[in-house]
Amino acid sequence: MSSADIARRAGGITERSVRYRLERLVSSGIIRVSAVADPKALGYPVLADVFIEVEPGQIMTVARTMTEFECVTYVACSTGASDLSIQIVAPDNAGLYRFVTEVVANVAGVRKTTTVLLPLVLKDVYQWTIPKSTCTD
């Protein structure tokens, strides 16, 4: 959406003000402007979360290893039943299965994996908006 469109939708603000505010938000690191590819459109319609239990002392090593795989879209350290959470995309269920059982399971330090297919995503991270209760001007 252009700065002019934002100014029109907001009402009472100039395009120049919108550009200035956006530049401030970007330069301060509050927002990032980036393109997000649609995995389905690129031939990766299968999406899954994989929860990983890791050997003690190996969490960061395994986490860093997971970031190196192209089909892994998200890596996070977690608490609770699993130590890591990753999200992966695959061309089909067989590809997902192979990646989890032949790649993830064989990474040094991985103790156990639990895979959850995500057939429908209603809201993705790039759709998050700042809660009105925390907005200040």
Located regions from the model:
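A compositional/biophysical signature of low hydrophobicity enriched in polar/charged and small residues
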Residues: 1-137
